[in-house]
Amino acid sequence: MRIGIEAQRIFRKNKHGMDYVVLQEVRELQKMDKKNEYFVFVAPGEDPCVEDTRNFHIIEIGGNSYPIWEQFTLPKAVKELNLDMLHCTSNTAPIRCKVPLILTLHDIIFLEPRDKSNKSFYQNLGWYYRRLVVPRIIKKCRRIITVSNYEMQNIMTKLDIPQERMAMIYNGYNEWFKPLEDTQEVYKKYIEEPGYFFFLGNTDPKKNTERTLVAYSRYLERSEVKRKLLMADLDKEYLDDIVERNHIENIKENIVIPGYIVNSDLPYIYNNAFAFLYTSLRESFGIPLLESMACGTPVITSNTSSMPEVAGSDAIFVNPEDPDDIVSNMLRLEEDDQFYRKQEKIGLQRAQEFSWQQTAEHLLNLYERVYKHR
């Protein structure tokens, strides 16, 4: 088979969720499949993190913007290479594509009501682009992959797609997320002392940052320990608005926001955290849940969308819209050592059920089925 994989953004320096997913899929396929020929389409960038091998060819193609790259430059390159299929990995694909198309549709949040006020121009453009493109390509796809049973049911219902055209393939997590001794004290690049709560909030309303910060304020009022809260990045003006609106000035001297955390440092951040807060209103999967659990760090997560499916039935679940529920579980971890140790073990065991190798194996099986029935 001659397989094309769209991985447009994996060479950029500051990668995000979908970039890491396709990067790990490509790396695992490189390890396991020496028979088929792959063409991985990327945009030029500062971090050439994948190299050519005998049967894997990295195709760098330029373009002034993502829509132009995907709708014009990519189809032209695909046509010239005479591929058997093209796997587009980040929710959208070329509207005009001459080869069998596989689409990974991580979620359909772009079809749901949203608050555009906190979004950048680029984020708003992406939202409109997905709303325009996805309905036009969805019926052309041979298979639509998504990352959880929750999201698969959501997609089937809202886009009227029969189950036989869907494939659910779980994400994995990187093998360097594991219990580690931070002998170099890497965490000190971001926060002075270990034993903090870690939270990946941002301005996206679905990340539930405001309610989580309200919960943290109430935690500080009730806790004798008063642990710091480490957040990766948050706009200062956005934070100030939350503090003023909710009268939670007490969080200001206890919250640490160092900016972007390098991915290679994240295992040390999780290992030195007391617990990880993943209190989103909605997630299609939630790789950070697995990363934290694989490091042996207890997680407090939401009882909504895919999070119970990923975290497993024995994890700590809260109502993300109830700050008091979040606080109660933060305090329970802090005050009940036996419960804390149990959650460490539960997380380690649950994380073992996921891997990028499994993800790649399922992908290869899907490619073979599409090729057979092309």
Model-found features: residue ranges?
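Carbohydrate transferase catalytic cores enriched for Leloir-type hexosyltransferases
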Residues: 1-374
